[in-house]
């Protein structure tokens, strides 16, 4: 199945290294390609301040986070390919990659795949859900040529 993807990438911060639009598109397509034929999605790259504000507002956690997912839910009678928005904090991704001894590219890919799975309805609150989501993430990330993101370095 081929995915018709409309991807809007918004850069609200700068950092040493960011994925290209093509990399983002590849990772999104890999994560959601078998779930739908058509998808619209926004990825917004933000600084720590914006991430912290959004995380505090929507999750009640007053600190920046790596990725926030905002699924779009249309009324049942309206069919739209709008999947939702991902907000990714570049500084948090950089820090986590360094702490976890991963390449920036591998960790960015993981955050995009992780966020897309949330947009598709996956979650990791309950242990069983977390196992299912992490297993799928690992499969998708390894399919992109990266190592298991949950394997200890």
UniProtKB/Swiss-Prot annotation:
Gene Ontology cellular-component terms for this entry are: cytoplasm
BP GO annotations: rRNA processing
Task: Name the PROSITE patterns on file.
Answer: UPF0054
> How cofactor binds (record note)?
Binds 1 zinc ion.
**Primary place of residence?**
cytoplasm
The prosthetic group or cofactor this protein requires is: Zn(2+)
Q: Name one GO molecular function term.
A: metalloendopeptidase activity
Instruction: Write out the residues that bind Zn(2+).
Output: 114, 118, 124
Enzyme nomenclature, EC number? 3.1.-.-
Which subcellular locations apply to this protein? Cytoplasm
Q: Which UniProt keywords apply?
A: Cytoplasm, Endonuclease, Hydrolase, Metal-binding, Nuclease, Ribosome biogenesis, rRNA processing, Zinc
Record family assignment:
Belongs to the endoribonuclease YbeY family.
Q: What does this protein do?
A: Single strand-specific metallo-endoribonuclease involved in late-stage 70S ribosome quality control and in maturation of the 3' terminus of the 16S rRNA.
- The protein in question is named Endoribonuclease YbeY
Q: Which organism is it from?
A: Shewanella baltica (strain OS195)
């Amino acid at each position: 199945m081929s995915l018709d993807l409309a991807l809007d990438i918004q850069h609200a911060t700068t950092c040493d290294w960011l994925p290209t639009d093509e990399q983002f598109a590849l990772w999104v397509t890999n994560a959601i390609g078998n779930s739908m034929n058509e998808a619209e999605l926004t990825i917004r790259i933000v600084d720590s301040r914006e991430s912290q504000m959004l995380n505090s507002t929507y999750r009640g956690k007053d600190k920046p986070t790596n990725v926030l997912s905002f699924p779009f839910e249309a009324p049942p009678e309206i069919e739209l390919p709008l999947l939702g928005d991902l907000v990714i904090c570049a500084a948090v991704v950089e820090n986590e990659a360094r702490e976890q001894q991963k390449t920036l590219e591998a960790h960015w890919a993981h955050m995009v795949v992780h966020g897309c799975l949330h947009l598709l309805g996956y979650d990791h609150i309950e242990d069983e859900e977390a196992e299912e989501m992490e297993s799928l993430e690992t499969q998708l990330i390894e399919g992109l040529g990266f190592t298991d993101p949950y394997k200890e370095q």
